[in-house]
């Protein structure tokens, strides 16, 4: 037992041997400890009852106001599905995607190995780009170039073949360079190709 520390027995008022300025042997101006109250706050509060009666097991009702069990819900999520938009991998099934003229592209995120090995900033946080629906190219009339619509090849071939041809052009003079004779070159150093 430490001789310096000798706790006083219970119920004995504090002697205050060193004269510390406690007025009546108890700090904070109390002559004795305040009486115990089961309520944390003074006064009656209908929401917080005074306490549990001795002998009752500790159990809190699911609905403190009425005591009734809340109604059963088959969904584990207390929020409805359509309250907040969720970006899905299939944007056409989302009620917030534009259904008609424009398709929505899902959010793009590069795979982790691409982000890890490159210094290019990946557009991970960019919103989905909206691009117009593809328009098919216009269908041609099925008529070959040089033919008149409504005719067959046999009808138009005679006109095409007997048409006047321009005057033929004389052949152009071509100069062929003189090449080095085969054999060992006169120089031995070949510069690199890069």
Curated annotation (Swiss-Prot):
The post-translation modification note in this UniProt entry reads: N-glycosylated.
User: Chief localization class?
Assistant: cytoplasm
Which InterPro entries does the record match to this protein?
FAM168A/MANI (IPR029247)
Q: Which residues lie on this side of the membrane: Extracellular?
A: 42-141
Where is the PTM N-acetylmethionine found along the chain? 1
Q: What Pfam families has UniProt attached to this entry?
A: TCRP1
Q: Which domain of life is it from?
A: Eukaryota
Q: Name one GO cellular component term.
A: perinuclear region of cytoplasm
Q: How does it sit in the membrane?
A: Multi-pass membrane protein
Location(s) in or outside the cell: Cytoplasm, Perinuclear region; Cell membrane; Cell projection, Axon
GO BP term, example: axonogenesis
- Hey, which stretches end up on the Cytoplasmic side? 1-18, 164-194
Query: What residue ranges are annotated as transmembrane?
Result: 19-41, 142-163
* Modification sites for Phosphoserine: 6
Q: Which residues are glycosylated?
A: 45
Tissue specificity is:
Predominantly expressed in the brain, including olfactory bulb, cortex and cerebellum (at protein level).
Induction and repression of expression:
Up-regulated by different neurotrophins, including NGF and BDNF, but not by growth factors, such as EGF.
Q: Which UniProt keywords apply?
A: Acetylation, Cell membrane, Cell projection, Cytoplasm, Glycoprotein, Membrane, Phosphoprotein, Transmembrane, Transmembrane helix
Purpose of the protein:
Inhibitor of neuronal axonal outgrowth. Acts as a negative regulator of CDC42 and STAT3 and a positive regulator of STMN2. Positive regulator of CDC27.
Tell me the protein family, please: Belongs to the FAM168 family.
What does the record note on quaternary structure? May form homodimers. May interact with DAZAP2, FAM168A, PRDX6, RBM6, TMTC1 and YPEL2. Interacts with CDC27.
What is the protein's given name?
Myelin-associated neurite-outgrowth inhibitor
């Amino acid at each position: 037992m430490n001789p310096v520390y000798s706790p006083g027995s219970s119920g004995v008022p504090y002697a205050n041997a060193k004269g510390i300025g406690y007025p009546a042997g108890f700090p904070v101006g109390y002559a004795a400890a305040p009486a115990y109250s089961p309520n944390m706050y003074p006064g009656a509060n209908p929401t917080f009852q005074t306490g549990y009666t001795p002998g009752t097991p500790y159990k809190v009702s699911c609905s403190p106001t009425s005591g009734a069990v809340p109604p059963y819900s088959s969904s584990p999520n207390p929020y409805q599905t359509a309250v907040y938009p969720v970006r899905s991998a299939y944007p056409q099934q989302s009620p917030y995607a534009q259904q008609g003229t424009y398709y929505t592209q899902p959010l793009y995120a590069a795979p982790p190995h691409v982000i890890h090995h490159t210094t290019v900033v990946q557009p991970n946080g960019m919103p989905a780009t909206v691009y117009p629906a593809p328009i098919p190219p216009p269908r041609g009339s099925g008529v070959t170039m040089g033919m008149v619509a409504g005719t067959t090849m046999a009808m138009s071939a005679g006109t095409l073949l007997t048409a006047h041809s321009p005057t033929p052009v004389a052949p152009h003079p071509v100069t062929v360079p003189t090449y080095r004779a085969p054999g060992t070159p006169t120089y031995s150093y070949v510069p690199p190709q890069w």
